[in-house]
């Protein structure tokens, strides 16, 4: 901070993360060492193919951080319309230049360096006058500086030599210094008035529009993260040069967010916002649109005339400004969502909603249960449209993905078992705060992490989601003050990144469980085949054993017929029509196939085999013959069918 120029407009400081990076590598390597399933996944999945590079990068990054001071700063300025950024950090031990040269050589792409490493003498010889595609690291005994323009780096180096900097005494610098009080691990700040003045279009109409929104008076944006473990906390502030006005004032003052009493304690994501009077917001938005000659509201009169209602008076005027949206399930076929809105006049709003359904020729069913009247209909798309239900309960409008979703919300509210009453939610409140706020964002971090893991290993996503029931809440609270909008959140020791680490560590156990389930299913299926073969032989003694799985299964007519060609002893999931002696059939992560030794339609022996689809679905192949013994072999999935003699050489399953 003391060495930066007064013209600095953006400031980002990050604490030294060398040790955390080292710990991540250590933990992951331990898991790789102990878990064969994880090693196979790491070596075969799409993401895992990049794994060794990621691991090596983290290791190098932790080594790099050993050379640096307590924090690294990214400072931004602007000359004309071109932003300029420099990365600056103190150095604390010798050898950094050699380390960087070696690392950049390793990262070089086909001989093209990704960055140039120089000392002061080397930098002086660079004659470039424009930003370069290849950034420069200037390594000095006291500082390391990185940028894409040699002239800017030289200018900053001169400032370091003179130990001169004006930012500390400037108002923006003083605001940044204030954020450091009490300690911080990550700090980001922007002088918005400087940025606005530098990026002004010169178009009076555009500049006036920005001013009219209220955001043209934005002063500073500051965000900081402090503490570690159970003491983690973040704070943000968007301040203004005076009282908030225009769109910047639409966020209301803190209030008790009572709509949270309708939110399920098992929700994955919930967002609540407290607006000022929605009807007044409509008026201000319309006025702004008209002043800029925007046609945003041009279609509203036609819409109102056709549907015979007033958007302002009949809808927005009946809402109290408090809105909550929640998502309870991420499964595409079981998507469950709800929206809860504060209502001023329930009778007026119900009349309006009924009129809109009638005007749009939407058929709605009406159900009454437990004192709650629920209306259900289909969204756009007719019978295939999304199911939507709504009910007005105790002064709140509940809209959800079907009757069940709405009924659950009403029950949660009346039973007092809502998210707002749960221990993990209450523990997420910032110190000294209640749930009086202008807005709130909530997430279940492990459930959110399952979405990321699910992209890599879809069969694990459901397990991770189920494991999120006892996870720590992650919430962000927003407060609308007269001349600022503030944000506070408590991580309680586990944020999304932490959840992903936990999930990654849990993968071996989840994989073991999945593999065990697949293998147990495969063994059970082979036992079913053996039993079916015995039954087939006694039913059709002239034929002996069935020649393939399809013969043991149902025929084209389904489960009605029982013939020697289709004995209907096994269901189609294992013995479909395509499951011939030359084809593999798939069930529960395993491929199945059966052949037989036959002469003139009489089969005297058979071999049935089950082998994993991939190395991620099992580690053992299984087989069985007419002796009824299940045998196994550890190794890669089979490509070819095995003979009866080869099967009998495998290890018998105990």
Q: What residue spans do the PLM features occupy?
A:
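Structural boundary/hinge residues at secondary-structure and domain interfaces
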Residues: 1-130, 169-221, 235-333, 347-363, ...
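A conserved glycine-rich beta-strand in the N-terminal activation segment of trypsin-fold
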Residues: 130-203, 383-464
């Amino acid at each position: 901070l003391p060495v930066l120029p007064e013209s600095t407009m953006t400031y980002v400081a990050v604490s030294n993360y060398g040790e955390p990076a080292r710990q991540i590598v250590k933990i992951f390597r331990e898991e790789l060492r102990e878990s064969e399933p994880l090693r196979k996944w790491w070596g075969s999945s799409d993401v895992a193919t990049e794994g060794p590079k990621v691991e090596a990068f983290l290791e190098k990054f932790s080594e790099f951080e050993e050379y640096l001071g307590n924090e690294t700063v990214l400072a931004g300025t602007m000359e004309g319309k071109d932003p300029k950024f420099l990365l600056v950090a103190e150095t604390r031990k010798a050898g950094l230049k050699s380390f960087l040269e070696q690392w950049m050589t390793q990262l070089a792409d086909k001989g093209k360096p990704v960055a140039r490493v120089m000392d002061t003498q080397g930098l002086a010889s660079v004659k470039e006058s424009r930003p370069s595609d290849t950034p420069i690291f200037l390594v000095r005994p006291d500082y390391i500086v990185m940028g894409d323009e040699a002239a800017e780096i030289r200018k900053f180096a001169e400032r370091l030599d003179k130990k001169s900097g004006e930012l500390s005494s400037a108002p923006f610098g003083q605001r940044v210094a204030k954020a450091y009080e009490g300690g911080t691990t990550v700090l980001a700040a922007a002088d918005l008035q400087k940025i606005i003045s530098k990026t002004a279009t010169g178009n009076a109409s555009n500049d006036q529009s920005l001013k009219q929104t209220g955001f043209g008076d934005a002063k500073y944006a500051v965000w900081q993260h402090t503490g570690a473990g159970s003491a983690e906390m973040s704070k943000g502030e968007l301040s203004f040069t005076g009282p908030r006005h225009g769109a910047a004032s639409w966020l209301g003052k803190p209030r008790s967010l009572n709509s949270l009493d309708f939110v399920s304690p098992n929700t994955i994501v919930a967002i609540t916002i407290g607006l000022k009077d929605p009807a007044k917001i409509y008026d201000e938005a319309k006025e702004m649109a008209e002043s800029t000659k925007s046609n945003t509201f041009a279609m509203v009169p036609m819409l109102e005339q056709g549907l015979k209602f007033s958007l302002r008076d009949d809808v927005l005027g009946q809402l109290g400004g408090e809105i909550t949206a929640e998502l309870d399930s991420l499964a595409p076929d079981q998507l469950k969502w709800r929206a809860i809105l504060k209502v001023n006049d329930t009778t007026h709003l119900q009349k309006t909603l009924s009129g809109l359904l009638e005007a749009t020729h939407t058929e709605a069913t009406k159900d009454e249960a437990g004192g709650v009247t629920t209306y259900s209909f289909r969204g756009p798309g007719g019978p295939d449209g999304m199911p939507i239900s709504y009910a007005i309960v105790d002064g709140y409008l509940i809209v959800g993905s079907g009757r069940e979703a709405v009924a659950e919300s009403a029950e949660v509210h009346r039973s007092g078992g809502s998210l707002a009453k749960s221990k993990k939610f209450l523990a997420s409140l910032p110190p000294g705060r209640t749930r009086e706020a202008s807005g709130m964002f909530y997430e279940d971090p492990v459930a959110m992490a399952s979405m990321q893991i699910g992209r890599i290993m879809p069969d694990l996503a459901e397990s991770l989601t189920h494991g999120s029931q006892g996870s720590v809440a992650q919430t962000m609270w927003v407060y609308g003050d007269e001349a600022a909008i503030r944000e506070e959140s408590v991580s309680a020791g586990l944020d999304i990144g932490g959840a992903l680490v936990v999930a990654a560590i849990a993968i071996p156990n989840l994989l073991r469980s999945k593999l065990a389930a697949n293998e147990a299913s495969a063994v059970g299926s082979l036992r079913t085949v053996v039993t079916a073969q015995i039954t087939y032989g006694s039913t059709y003694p002239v034929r002996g054993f069935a020649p393939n799985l399809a013969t043991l299964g149902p025929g084209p007519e389904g489960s009605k017929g029982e013939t020697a060609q289709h004995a209907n002893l096994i269901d189609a999931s294992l013995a479909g029509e395509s499951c011939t002696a030359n084809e593999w059939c798939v069930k529960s992560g395993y491929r199945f196939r059966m052949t037989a030794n036959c002469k003139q339609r009489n089969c005297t022996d058979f071999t049935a085999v089950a082998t994993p689809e991939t190395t991620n679905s099992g580690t053992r192949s299984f087989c069985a013959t007419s002796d009824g013994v299940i045998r196994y072999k550890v190794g890669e999935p089979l490509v070819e069918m095995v003979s009866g003699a080869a099967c009998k050489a495998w290890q018998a399953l105990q």
